[in-house]
Structure formats: C-alpha cells, structure tokens
Amino acid sequence: YVTGFLYWFLNYCPMMVNFYKEGQKKAIRKESFGFFFEGIWWRSIYLYNAREQGHHAIELAKRGCAKSYFLATIMSHNLIVGESEATHKRCITILTAAQKEYLKDDKDGTLNKFIPELSFVIDNTPFPNLLLKNSPNEMSWQMGYKKPNGAIGGSMNQVLGVSAKDDSDKLRGKRGWILYEEMGTFDGLLELYDVTRKSVEDGDYTFSCMYLVGTANNKESSFLSAKKLLYAPESYNIQSVPNVYDKKGSGKDVFGFFFPAYINRAGCYNKDGISDVIKALLQVLMARYKAKYGADPTSVLRVIAEDPITPAEAIIKVKDAYFPVASLQERADTLDKNPSLYDDIYVGELYTTGTGEIEFRPTDDIPIRTYPVDNDTKGALEIYSMPKKDREGKVFNDRYIIGVDPKSLGLILVIK
C-alpha cells in the first residue's frame, strides 16, 4: 500500500531529479516529480507504522536519498491538509536543526525544498491556498484568512522552523510533529529528545510524532548521542526494526531505519524502482578497493562513510587518523554483541613477592571499557595473554614493547 505521505511526495512535491541516458555517463538535473524507489517506500511504511503504533521514528541514511525532500513533504502535507482526516485543523509541524544553514531557504536547507512544494500545491491544486502568514525570514507559515469582521478562518495549520542547537527550551511546549534535521549535529541530543517527548506524549499515548534523520559522513556530526537512539530505539519509544543491516554477530538485534548505499544506487535499479543489490554492492566495494591504494590513507574511510553498507560505516568520523577505523568499529560492535568474549581476559593487579619477583593476582576491580569516564574512575589491569617464558621460567628479552600515555587515563600498553 501507499501511505498518505508517499502519495503526497509522488504527486504534489516537485524536486530536483537526476536523469540518466543508457550508455552515457552524462546526467542532467532538472525539476520533476520524484521516482518511486523501494527505499523511499520502506521509509514511508516505517514512518506510518511508527505513528500508528504510538512511537517516534529515526533514520540514518546515505546521501542523496531524498531525506530533506521527504521532511519537506511532511511539512507541506501537514500545513495544507493536516495530518489526517481526524486532525486537519490547528496541526503544528516544527522543523528543527542545530545549525541554521540546515533550515534556511537560501542555504539549500530543508526550507529550500519546502517552499517550492508549497508554491506548486497552491498554484496547481484545489486544496486550500490562503496563507495567514508566509514569512521565510521568520521561518513561519500558517494557513487561514481574515474574515471581514476580523475573525480568523481556515485550518490555521502551522509550519515553524526552529534553530534549537542544544537549547531544549526552544522546543519545550511545541505540541506537534517535530522533525530533526541532521540529528548528529546536536551535541545534547538525548537531553533535547527527552524534554521534547513531554510535549508530544501524554502518559502512554503519543499524539504527535518526532522524526529524527541523519546523514552518513556529515562532517559536523559526531553521532555520540544519536547512536544510543539508533541502537536502543525501544528504550526511547522509537519504532524499531530487526537489525538486518549489520554483519552477523555484530551490532544489536534491533535498529532504527537505515537507508544503505546499495539501495536505489544510481544505475542499479529497474524501471519499478527495485534495487539490483548485487550490482550496487560490487560498485561500492570496487570504489573502496581503488581508494585503498590512493595517496591519502584516509581516502578509503571517506569512501566508506559516503557509501555505507552498514550503520557503523555511516557514522565513522573521518579525521586525520591512520588507524583501521572500519575494522576497529567492527570489532567494537562484535564485543558489544558478545560480552562473553571478555571472559578470557585476566583482571587483577601486580605485586612484588618476597624474592623481588613481579607476580599477578586476580581482583574484582572493574576495567574501563566505555568512554568517556569520570575522573575518579579507578579502572583495572587487564592481561589478554600472559607473558611467554623460556625454559628457565624467565620472560623472553626484547619480545614486548611498553607504550605509555601519560595523559588522559594514564594508560600503559604492553604489546607483543
């Protein structure tokens, strides 16, 4: 079935679309209506189920999959006709972002997509078209009109743009749909989310939906807070789906909605918008292979983060790092999924015997395995493998290297 938002998206929301000719690499970009893509259909079904079941929604996605256009669709739909037949008057929709450029119509933000959609519907459809307020500068729109006697008529539906940063007071009391653009840029996202939940929930009931979206490899995003919402959605009343995205044995059992690089990749789908996943994956992996042998060691990380296959790849923070970030992230996900892997690690302390020998004894101290930590956290010594000794019971000379980090946690690493 086609949801109301998807129907509106396909029929009333012109956008800039890429067109390709078979056998040519040249493409043109022009205004048209969006194509029917299975990934966008999945998104609409996910959002519909979230609303119907009284949950909120969250999405992590690749670039170029119409996230901002879909947010603009929700805004224009709710402004002109309301959320539904039951709630078609005084419906409020708020678009919020940590930075104003994600909103403003002159910065190619979401409002830059919303305003043309609104103009098209007003000019070309018989839907209500009288605006009581139309102020891009104030990021405020309201349907309605003034009657001759001065009274206000019409639906009085509203759309507001709010640059919230981490100030939860800007969203406090806003009782309507709340759309978070580039959620990863909110440093205090969890606190902001918890506060705004009170504005859209009443006990166990949810009367408006919050929808959070984030883009893979956004340079301004850290995703520190967003990861908790993505990997533990049910703890925050967010619609979850089975985690079919991560590799088996890594990640959590459930996740939010993820739009990976192999879904609806350009040139890798048929006329019905159904993806050729194998073809897309081969292209993605070939691009990584080529980047691996480039001059810049971080190039492969950027390629991975731009076209993520798994959620962990989408939130890689690409900096001037020369560590195998993707492999480390995969290992971290495996440990999160299987904490029993820590069972073979020795935890304890070192002491000096009466003969001057250094020995190890186990303790019940708790090692530091999550960051950041409080300054007064004690931590513990962990040994992954006991030192190898020769036939005389002595540790081999020159076999181990000790590295010391004098700052931060005062970390000492013994490496074989």
Name each model-derived stretch:
Residues 1-56:
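Pre-P-loop entry segment of helicase/translocase ATPase cores
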Residues 52-75:
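Walker A/P-loop
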Residues 61-64, 98, 215-218:
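Conserved H-loop
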Residues 72, 108, 112, 116, ...:
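RNase H-like, metal-dependent nuclease domains and their acidic two-metal-ion catalytic environment used
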Residues 78-90:
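Post-Walker A helix-loop "phosphate-sensing" segment adjacent to the P-loop in P-loop NTPases
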Residues 89-165, 239:
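Conserved nucleotide-state-sensing and coupling region of NTP-binding domains
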Residues 100-103, 166, 216-220, 263-266:
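Conserved nucleotide-binding/hydrolysis micro-motifs of P-loop NTPases
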Residues 196-207, 213:
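Substrate-engagement module of ASCE P-loop NTPases
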